[in-house]
Amino acid sequence: MKSFLAAIALFISFSTSAQYYYQDIVGTKETSAIMKAYRDNKVNRVVLNSYDENNTRSNDFYVEQQFSAVNQTLKTTTRSDMDHESVLTSYLDGNNNVIKTTDSSNIVTTVTNYTYNADGMLVSITSFSSDSAKRTTESEQHLWQYNNNKIARMLRIKNATDTTYIDFKLDGAGNVIEEQETRKGVKSPSIYYYYDNNNRLTDIVRYNNKAKRLLPEYMFEYSPANLVIQKITVPSNNDNYLIWRYQYNGQGLKTKEVIYNKQKELTGKIEYQYSFGL
């Protein structure tokens, strides 16, 4: 079970790394799509049951989601053990856009607000984080800029004083293919995005210091219904990648995640249990 929890922890920490287009634009749309699927299928509760590499049920990692179609909210409660619990609540507007999230744990609470332009394009993400004792507060803004309704630049502003500029390059189809951040005049290595013939994101690539070459950090495969059926995550500081394989039911709701390590050995799995009702 330790290896399974380590895999989950690695994925969570890896998901917070700086791929701004993927995290802000793609990730926010994924949350909206999940909530829309729950609403369309009258889902009101989801329980994620975890199993280790020996197919033994574990209560060390527990996730429960509660969806309210009336309030347009999705509350996700995650417990990694008896002492560590976090609650993430996401809110939608009438256009199915995520407009707010609150993420709270025993240590930190983060409130994030999202705004959109008249065309439904994300223009700002503003987050405020404070510790449980209210002794420290941090803020971060992501201000998205567009040129002819296509992504051009994003400003990341921390605590209203520290600004990083993230510039984007697009292909002929309008897909983001490169992002590069500049802070205090110093440019960071670029992140590259690759797509298939259907304009679906297939790879996110950056320079790997250990390998001394460009390597993918994410790789995606899709079903004919455009659902992600496999995701490979590769940490930037090593090559111990994880393979996540997904299964869905006929309504497009995720039913199972199976996780393998680099050696193709089963690390664990997660099964989804749905409850339905208005």
Predicted segment positions?
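Positively charged n-region of N-terminal signal peptides that target proteins for export
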Residues: 1-5
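N-terminal signal peptide c-region/cleavage motif recognized by signal peptidases
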Residues: 13-15
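Buried hydrophobic residues that stabilize the cores of well-folded domains
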Residues: 19-278
